[in-house]
């Protein structure tokens, strides 16, 4: 059975600015046979997506929450610990501009 499921964000602290892109990755330490990955938010039963990678192309306020990755080998499944994703407010149009 799959075990050691880990989940991480490509941005520090799993924080993303509203409208920016966020990528989450999932990996499994042990498991044999074909493995399937599914993504869940807030304990929802229906998967958001499948595959070892979840990409939110334009993060919105409703994308904040706890994400989990579930890995299954067809017979049994294991889940990652929840990762809290925070979508921050509007990007400051002055950011990066010279004073």
Predicted features and spans:
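Extracellular/luminal immunoglobulin-like beta-sandwich modules
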Residues: 1, 68-91
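Solvent-exposed loop segments of extracellular immunoglobulin-like
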Residues: 28-43
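Surface-exposed loops/turns
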Residues: 18, 50, 61-64
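A short beta-strand segment in extracellular, disulfide-stabilized domains
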Residues: 15, 20-28
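Short beta-strand segments within Ig-like beta-sandwich modules, predominantly Fibronectin type-III
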Residues: 43-53
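Surface-exposed, proline-enriched loop/turn segments that connect beta strands in immunoglobulin-like
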Residues: 7-13, 41-43, 95-98
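Conserved Ig-like domain signature around the intradomain disulfide
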Residues: 22-24, 35-37, 62-74
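Short, flexible loop/turn segments at beta-strand junctions in immunoglobulin-like
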Residues: 15, 57-60
């Amino acid at each position: 059975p799959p075990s050691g499921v880990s989940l991480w964000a490509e941005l520090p602290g799993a924080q993303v600015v509203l409208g920016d892109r966020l990528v989450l990755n999932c990996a499994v330490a042990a498991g044999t046979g074909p493995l399937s990955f599914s993504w869940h938010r807030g304990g929802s039963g229906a998967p958001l997506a499948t595959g070892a990678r979840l990409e939110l192309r334009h993060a919105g306020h409703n994308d904040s929450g706890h994400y989990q990755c579930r890995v299954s080998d067809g017979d049994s499944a294991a889940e990652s610990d929840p990762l809290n994703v925070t979508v921050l407010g509007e990007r400051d149009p002055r950011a990066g501009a010279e004073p």
